[in-house]
């Protein structure tokens, strides 16, 4: 797998954007990721827009990546695509921004989710339309237990029913654990339709408001009660060959300790999990 800046590992270990918080600059994000072992960074549309507002150009961003031998390996996050009413001018602009980012950085897939709870028939139609707008890019649909696509089975139903080859899926440890997914949950999902994996972990007791927990209080892989090792083994044994192994530890308390600490902590935790569960793609 390659991007516009050169060669990549087959499955780059990628630090997700939220793992380093929302306030960090583009140069700092790249530097911290590179210095703490990661192969790539995930970049949200908001991160990209902030970089432009800070005076960087596309060429500047590519140069900064090249200087650190770093890649953007994931682009995110498309939401509010389920109905015509939700697709406001702002939403459409953000969607086009993610398409531009993916092509600029040579990323083949874009992460998306649907928070709105609408009829499944409408989700199927809307997902197909989103895939058509994405053209050659893959749409990675992420199931979330508090969303309109609550579990892996629902995600695969709509991806299959929309009839687009570029409708694929994302599996995240946090959502997997909180949606009570098991090896049985993945049995009917083709392995080649899972485009990426995101590692983290969960507390023993869920918050009353799951989205609040998801966006503020995740744990590093293998350090909680979500059985991250077991999760990774299930995906490996199913035959999944992800384009990206993301590490999405969204934690206010961890970011508050410092970006370097956060990056090194989640890198080491990820390596420990993958050494046990999936040594073929564990960082060396």
Residue ranges and their predicted role:
Residues 16-20, 44-48, 77-80, 115-117, ...:
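Active-site beta-loop-alpha junctions enriched in small/polar residues
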Residues 42-66, 117:
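Glycine-rich, proline-tolerant flexible connector loops at the mouths of alpha/beta enzymes
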């Amino acid at each position: 797998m390659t991007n516009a800046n050169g060669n990549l590992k087959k499955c780059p270990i990628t630090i997700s954007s939220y793992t380093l918080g929302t306030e960090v600059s583009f140069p700092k994000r790249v530097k911290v990721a590179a210095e703490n072992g990661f192969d790539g960074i995930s970049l949200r549309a908001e991160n990209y827009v902030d970089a432009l507002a800070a005076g960087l150009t596309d060429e500047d961003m590519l140069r900064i990546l090249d200087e650190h031998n770093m890649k953007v390996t994931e682009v995110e996050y498309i939401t509010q695509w389920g109905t015509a009413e939700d697709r406001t001018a702002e939403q459409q602009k953000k969607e086009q921004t993610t398409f531009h980012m993916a092509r600029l950085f040579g990323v083949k897939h874009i992460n998306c989710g649907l928070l709105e709870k609408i009829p499944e028939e409408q989700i199927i139609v809307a997902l197909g339309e989103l895939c058509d707008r994405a053209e050659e890019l893959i749409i990675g649909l992420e199931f979330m237990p508090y969303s309109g696509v609550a579990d892996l089975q629902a995600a695969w139903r709509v991806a299959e029913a929309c009839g687009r080859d570029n409708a694929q899926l994302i599996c995240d440890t946090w959502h997997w654990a909180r949606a009570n997914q098991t090896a049985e949950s993945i049995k009917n999902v083709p392995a080649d339709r899972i485009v990426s994996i995101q590692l983290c972990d969960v507390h023993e007791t869920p918050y009353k408001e799951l989205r609040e927990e998801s966006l503020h209080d995740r744990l590093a892989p293998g350090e909680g009660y979500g059985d991250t090792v077991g999760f990774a083994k299930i995906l490996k044994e199913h035959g999944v060959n992800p384009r990206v192994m993301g590490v999405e530890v969204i934690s206010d308390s961890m970011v508050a300790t410092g970006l370097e600490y956060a990056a090194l902590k989640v890198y080491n935790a990820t390596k420990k999990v993958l050494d046990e569960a999936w040594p073929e793609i564990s960082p060396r």
